[in-house]
Amino acid sequence: MSRMALVIAFVPALIGPASAQKAEIEAANAKWTEFYNKGDFAGMASLYTDDAIALPNGSAMVQGRAAIEAMWKGILAEHVGDPKLTTLDVKPLGPSAAREIGTFSLKTKGPRSQEVSGKYVVVWEKVGNNWKLATDIWNDGN
């Protein structure tokens, strides 16, 4: 078989799983946003692996699902709302892991509400049939 025939045969096989992963991860992001907007921090935490690590902008590393739930509940939820996540790229790291790069915007709460925007990187792990955040890092700015 020629090289071109091999490329034609295998490229669709590679694109299919990647686009499926992206769609599943975008659905998980939508669920995260839904939980956030409802103030359901336990629901948000359920989207992380048990041993997940969050690396918030300008703050100490947070490790473990319970600590991540407390982080969202105690620190950020009081100060920001209306999160919007935009997935820019999802790169499969095998059948049960993926790296996502995206941007976010939030609105600060209070009398002088401002929009804050930034970027993030998430490493996702497939746990059973669900994608879960294993590593979550973000910072503000473009």
Each language-model region and where it sits:
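A solvent-exposed, acidic/Ser-Thr-rich amphipathic alpha-helical stretch
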Residues: 22-28, 40-96, 105, 109, ...
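Sec/Tat signal peptide C-region and signal peptidase I cleavage site
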Residues: 16-20
